[in-house]
Curated annotation (Swiss-Prot):
One of its GO terms (cellular component) is cytosolic large ribosomal subunit. GO terms for biological process: translation. Belongs to the universal ribosomal protein uL29 family. NCBIfam families: L29. The lineage of its organism: Bacteria, Bacillati, Mycoplasmatota, Mycoplasmoidales, Metamycoplasmataceae. This is Large ribosomal subunit protein uL29. Gene3D superfamilies: 1.10.287.310.
Amino acid sequence: MKFKDINVKPVAELEQMVNDLKAELFTLRFQNSTGQLDQTHKIKMVRQDIAKVLTALSQKNRGAQ
């Protein structure tokens, strides 16, 4: 997920994305602990996506003040 794509989305959609990504991360961690996850790099990718979305949210909130 590119930061440019994230940065143009509205705040409500970004908050929904964070919730969805956190749920996906939970699922991936659970699959990893049970040995069902073959592509463990997805955990890192989802964590980075969460960080990108949270950064965009922070920037939007800072700009609105």
